[in-house]
């Protein structure tokens, strides 16, 4: 993982966010969230999933357009996993929430959960009073063994447009461990 935390000059998401937030702030966010750079597709973004104990669980590789900041989805969706690229045959992927490693450092902050890793980075800049986590997708990491790290935390759910109904089904699971669960408006 540590070797990937460099070469940001060829990381399309870093390039885009530097134009929006400034290079210094983008560097801070990439370091805070341990976002890396992969050689895949000539330079892409690695979102490391690191658990509360600091153990790397997975690395999701995604390609972004450096001008628009959008994911590249044509002619195909450019998403892969580090363990796939390294051909780790017996790798047992056990995902966690993106940004989970930040929970231990901010034990009293409320938690806000979004779908996309990029959204967690951007929201962390604009609304730093929360620990911003990402599920990695509409269904993402909403499992009993994953949400246990949110025990006794106040949680705000911020689903993408059209995903509120799907996330509504997860409230009961979250309510069993969190002190409070609400949806953003």
Give each language-model segment a name.
Residues 113, 150-164:
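Acidic beta-strand-to-loop metal/phosphate-binding motif
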